[in-house]
Amino acid sequence: MAWLWLLCALLPAFMVSVTANSPPSFGVNMTLVTLPEDLPVGAVAFWLVATDSDNDHLTYGISGPNASYFSVNANTGEVKLASPLDFETVPFFKITISTSDGLNIRTAEMQVIVEDRNDNIPVFLNTEFSTSINETLPVGSVVFSVLAEDKDTGTAGLVQYFIEKVIPSTANSNNLFRILENGSIVLNDTLSYNNKSAFYQLELKACDSGGILDNKPKTQCSQPVFVSISVIDEPDLDPRFIREFYSASVAEDATLGTSVLTVEAVDSDKGINDIVTYSVSNSTRPGWFDIREDGVIFVNGSLDREQLLLENEEVQIQVTATEKNLNIYGQEAKASMWVTIRVTDVNDHKPEFYNCSLPGCSFSPQEAQVNFIGYVDEHASARISIDGLTMVAYDPDQGDNGTFLLSLNGQDAEAFNVSPERAAGSVSVQVVVRNSEMVDYEKETVMVVEVVATDSVSNNYSVATVTIHLRNINDHRPVFSQSLYELTVPEHCPTGYLVTDKIQATDLDGDEWGPITYSLLPGNGADLFEVEPNSGNLTVKNGTLLDREKQAVYYLTLQATDGGNQSTTTALEITLLDINDNPPVVRGSYNVFVPEENGNVSVTIQAYDDDQPDTNNSLLVFSLLPGPYSSNFSLDPNTGLLRNLGPLDREAIDPALEGRIVLTVIVADCGEPSLSTNVNVTITVEDINDNLPVFNQSYEFSVWERVPGAWVGTVKAWDADQTAANNRISFSLSGTGANNFILQGNVLEQGWAEGSLWLLPDVRLDYETQKFFHLTVSAENPGPQGLDSTANVTVTVMDVNDEPPTLDAASLQAISVTENGSEHGQVTRVIAQDVDTAALLRIELVDVICTKAGVDVGSVCHGWFSVDGNGSVYINQSEAIDYEACHLVTLVVRAYDLNTDPGFDAYSSNGSLLINIKDKNDNAPYFLPNNQTFVIIPELVLPNQQVASVQARDEDSEDNGIIMFSILKAEFVRKDGTSNPVQVFRITRSVEAGLFTGSIELVTNLDSTIQGTYQVTVQAQDQPTLGPALETQTTLNLFTVDQSYRVRLQFSTSKEDVGANMEEIKEALIQATRTSVYVVTIQNIDSTARARASSYMDAYFVFSNGTALTLTELNMMIRKDQDALRQLLQLGLVVVSSQESQEPDQQKLLTSVIIGLVVSLVLVLVILITALVCLRKSYHRKLRAMKAGKEARKTPIETTAPTAAIPGTNMYNTDRANPVLDLPTKDLGLECHSSSDLDYDSLNSLDENSVDLDMDSKEFKRKDLPGDPPEPDPEPLTAVLSGRSAGASEQQKKNLSFTNPGLDTTDL
């Protein structure tokens, strides 16, 4: 009990000590913390700080889903980062922090905010980085657009774009593009496929605008991307000629079509290389030359060098090169160049004579003369020229071709000479006295000679006749001491130069005739000299005209005249002394084209000097003016032959000269002083492709796989040839995998070219397939040797990831399967390929397409085939395969790789396996249903005429579906059932759109008198190439209509009228009978045979089932159709009869009349007797009338409207309308009880006898109308019938009576 008191005493103290231990608490700043996302793992993130009023030791902890980010020191509260933070993934999160003093635990929720840092680089979002643009794209156009994204925020996420590098890197291309803030790449300058580059690669980089990272400012940039830009060449440039000038020579006698030279032009648009054609657009001599489309200039007309003397013997033609297609401006792209063609001389002219004086001759061919007149004194001294003769000989040819010989012919040729005897070009011709004794006026007053000019080369000649008139002289005349004075004078001497003062004449007559005066007779240059009349001194009158090169010797006649006018003459031979006054003249121009290396220069400089031949003044010496390349040539100083001393090398010539070596040849004479002429000889050393392009190194490049269009690297080559045609370097790639790359060539300068190696825009390299590409780059130019140089290029593929499988195209080749269970099991196998080494491939069926004749037929073939996972194709339902249901089965398959890495396409493209279903002859032909009834009217059907037809099809194809028809059996079945075979039919075949038609034709005429049906069995059989043929039969019934159904219709109109109304008649007959009307004949009737009918028509009326109408049936049907009957009557129908109805002859007509009279007489007697008997039997008639009344009350009223009478009869077209011919259907009790009853009467033979009847009877009581006059008592039977019809309308009563117009005809 004591311990209980002790416990009660200590319990309050214990409670006080427990309640005094307070729990720890966190500070107010422990609810939120901000940490940068770039805080390194392991760094102190923050401290957990708590306080405990009891100063107990505290421990710390962190819990919750995000506690893994941190690690905490439980004793110190230091919190370190355990996992990296990422603002872009988790921008903020919560953790639970806790502290404990060992007894109490305090928790709190802390918000951790992650602060963004610039830790992300921009990433391009584009999937493709290639494009193509036209070279004419306007400046400022957007070429391509890129987009990059930066996941950071603020300025760190603001993306800017930069163009780091442009390949090729030139001053022009570096500024060719610019990129906008939105990523649009804009063209900054003009493009040119030919003058700049055809391909560009832009290295782009995207950078953010900067931010803080690791406590420092940081700007992040993306990995570079490469944008490939292909420039598409546009036709914007004109063509250009390969050479800067063209020249050639051709002989003037060249035939039409002779090739002169070839010009060549190329399209300046290298990427298009359009076809260039050539034409002559202008010419100094139109029509002389033309050009073919391939650039060959040829002779197109007759040439004549002599017409070109004023044009330096050259023809200029303007050649225009035109591209085949229009340029981008819609205009022709063309360029022009003048071509020089020198026409060389041939000896095509003979010398001619002209009546003129040099140098004033025009030498027009029309002015050539053949007759000349001259004068000379008799006994003139030898070598005295004929005065008054102005003859010039001229040959327009050049050089030796223009040299000719002069001679004399004729009866007086011995008396004269011609001077000169040899000349070239043009010369004044003088005829001089040779034998003065023969020149005797007393013997001949007129002498004739022929001057012959003969071509020195061709022996062509011309003849001129000179008529010389002799002058008579006196015997005493002045006499010169010499008959010929040989004088000399320098050419071009001063005017007044004294030639001689030694010539004197004496006159034997003394002074009788006065002093002697001297004068020069005109002609042959006499106007160039003058003589002093008194002294005889000879001086030069005009020294400037004395030119030895034009005329070396002048033959003048000096006349001495005495006072008696007697005169004498002497010959003056004045020879001009040559001075060196003419420099050498070089013929033509010299442009030589020679290929380098093996080409040889061999050209002779042709020159001449007009100074005196065989003197130093005309002796020419050739020399070369020293120059840069003159040492490579030799020039013969005497002949002017220029040769090269060794092989010429185009590459040794300054490229600026473009292969042209201009040599200056000095042509000098040896006179005093020496005169010279310079001529330039242009030797164009034509470049040949004798230098190979060379590379300066081998190349190693690397490229990432799966990056299409990536730039790989650049190779360079150099060609020493100088012309663009020969140093144009084209690059080509060879080696395994070369087709994955494209090498874009770009011409640099001075024979250098570079090739940019790119991946094709649509090619993605695969590291697993090929890690290295060992390529060979070939540099070649279009030389005939076909040689090239190469460089090794190694491309290393850097690995990224892989490719989808592909289907083997060979395994998808179309196969054929025969229908209807002909084949089973596997028919083919689809093979798939995958360049990946770990590929696990399967084949799956994607779709099945069933088509027949190109038309989709749905799912009819879906179960026929199956595809196994290994690609094996099996037949599932062999028996179900049916060609007639489906012609072509298309299995759409694809391959997939089970081991494809995520993110890559595991499926191949769909492939189509075509399975052609081969037809088997499994379908017999079948006849198409034919509801037509075939009817034969033998009288109307002729041989070779179609009487029936069948149509058949065969669902098989080709030969299996071709149908042939045959008649297996044909028999005639009579109406009594008997039959017999016939051979009267044949069958022909036609086909249209797969439908075969068999036409059954008659072979011979049919018998029109027999009745029955032809049964024809037709067989359709196909024509298979393999296996048995299949056939089908059908039997046709051909109904015959014999002559018993022939009906004759008589008309009141003529045969012609019936024929004209035939269509209306047939239409009315068809309307009434509903049959087909077959007209046999239409004939006129003898006018004496009938009273009304004028013509008849025989016809058949046949139903569609093969039956025909008889005469009776036709009558009934026509009577029933009132509209048709009315129309036929209007068209003249009179009688319908059988064919046997013939017109009676006169004898028969007479017999008929007699018989008719006898019958009429008997009839009259019978009527009289009958009337008497009826009077006696009136009582019996009364009884019968009463009985008839009773019967009439039992019979319904039938009011029959009057109908039209049938023409030619006493019958009406209504049933029971003819009481005489038709028996009543109801017995009214009027018949006699026995055949011997004398009181028997017909219904239309009622008399007027009255019968005592009860008129008050209800049945017979008449209702009188007011005002009606009294009527006589009716005949008893009439009253009975009238009473029965009481109540009918008045119109009905009126219609009970009619008049029969048929009684008007004579046909009774």
Swiss-Prot record:
Signal peptide (UniProt feature, chain positions): 1-20
PROSITE patterns found in the cross-reference section: CADHERIN_1, CADHERIN_2
Pfam families: Cadherin (PF00028)
Keyword Transmembrane: yes
GO biological process: cell-cell adhesion mediated by cadherin; epithelial cell differentiation; homophilic cell adhesion via plasma membrane adhesion molecules; intermicrovillar adhesion; negative regulation of cell growth involved in contact inhibition; regulation of microvillus length
Membrane topology annotation: Single-pass type I membrane protein
Record bears the keyword Transport: no
Region (Disordered): 1251-1308
Cellular localisation: Apical cell membrane; Cell projection, Microvillus membrane; Cell junction
Molecular functions (GO terms): calcium ion binding; cell adhesion molecule binding
Function comment: Intermicrovillar adhesion molecule that forms, via its extracellular domain, calcium-dependent heterophilic complexes with CDHR5 on adjacent microvilli. Thereby, controls the packing of microvilli at the apical membrane of epithelial cells. Through its cytoplasmic domain, interacts with microvillus cytoplasmic proteins to form the intermicrovillar adhesion complex/IMAC. This complex plays a central role in microvilli and epithelial brush border differentiation. May also play a role in cell-cell adhesion and contact inhibition in epithelial cells.
UniProt remark on domains: The cadherin 1 domain is required for binding to CDHR5.
Protein name: Cadherin-related family member 2
Native source organism of the sequence: Mus musculus (Mouse)
Lineage: Eukaryota, Metazoa, Chordata, Craniata, Vertebrata
